[in-house]
Every structure is written in C-alpha cells, then in structure tokens.
Amino acid sequence: MKRKMLKSKIHRATVTGADLHYEGSITIDSELMKQADILPYEAVDIWNVTYGTRFQTYAIEGQPGSGVICINGAAARMVSKGDMVIIASWIDIDADKAAAYEPKLVFVDDKNVPTTQKSENPGQGSLRNAI
C-alpha cells in the first residue's frame, strides 16, 4: 500500500506577479525549486494564505535568485501581487516507510529569500506545536 505524503513546501512565499495571459503554471525562482525538491512541470498545490483559496497547477523555473513567485493563466484570478502563499508538492511512498518520512520545508522572508530549510518532525518542536 502507498500513502500520499507531503514531499516539500515553500512556506509563506510572497506572490510577485500574476499573468492571466500566460498558458498556465506557477513560475518559481529556480533556486527555491531546488531547495524544495520541486522539478519543472511537477504538480504543486497553491494555498493562498491571504484569501484562503486553493488550487493546483504545475511549476516552471524562474530566474535563479530573483525571488519570483508568479501565478500564470486562469489561476492568476485567484491571487494578487503581495498575497502570501504556501506551495506544496506530494509523494506516494510505501506505507511501511511513511512513519519515518520527513518532508523538506523551505521558509522564506517577504522577498522570497530562504531563511531556513528543515524537515518537519511532528511532536518535536515542529510547526504542529506552534499552531
């Protein structure tokens, strides 16, 4: 049996743009993608912290070090520049490995510069305890 687990997330990134007329996707600074282990064209969920909307799209690489987080295509109607979002990717893993699995978490500042990168371990000083 497989379990769907959080593979990685870019936590509380700031949307730098929204391009309604682009084909679709989310453009993410390629350095952030590498840190979060997100590949080009990989499916990602976007959770808009500012407005509570959620949608799925796919990632494309933006200029490294630019901090770009740009929502493209129809999903551009679901965000505004300056909104705070969480970008999540998923993995299917064997059930017997799920309990020990730890996702990659990339925390960024308001310019989308990474501040920390860590794994989340519930119950041991993780985000779960902070909520």
Curated annotation (Swiss-Prot):
Compositional bias annotation for Polar residues: 113-131
PTM characteristics: Is synthesized initially as an inactive proenzyme, which is activated by self-cleavage at a specific serine bond to produce a beta-subunit with a hydroxyl group at its C-terminus and an alpha-subunit with a pyruvoyl group at its N-terminus.
SS bond partners: none
One annotated GO molecular function: aspartate 1-decarboxylase activity
Any one of the GO CC terms: cytosol
Keyword flag Protein transport: no
Endoplasmic reticulum recorded as keyword: no
Binding positions (substrate): 57, 73-75
Subcellular location: Cytoplasm
Pathway recorded for this protein: Cofactor biosynthesis; (R)-pantothenate biosynthesis; beta-alanine from L-aspartate: step 1/1
In-chain residues carrying the UniProt-annotated modification Pyruvic acid (Ser): 25
Region (Disordered): 112-131
Catalytic activity: L-aspartate + H(+) = beta-alanine + CO2
Active site location: 25 (schiff-base intermediate with substrate), 58 (proton donor)
Chief localisation class: cytoplasm
EC number assigned by the record: 4.1.1.11
Family per similarity comment: Belongs to the PanD family.
Quaternary structure (record): Heterooctamer of four alpha and four beta subunits.
Role, per record: Catalyzes the pyruvoyl-dependent decarboxylation of aspartate to produce beta-alanine.
Protein name: Aspartate 1-decarboxylase
Organism: Syntrophotalea carbinolica (strain DSM 2380 / NBRC 103641 / GraBd1)
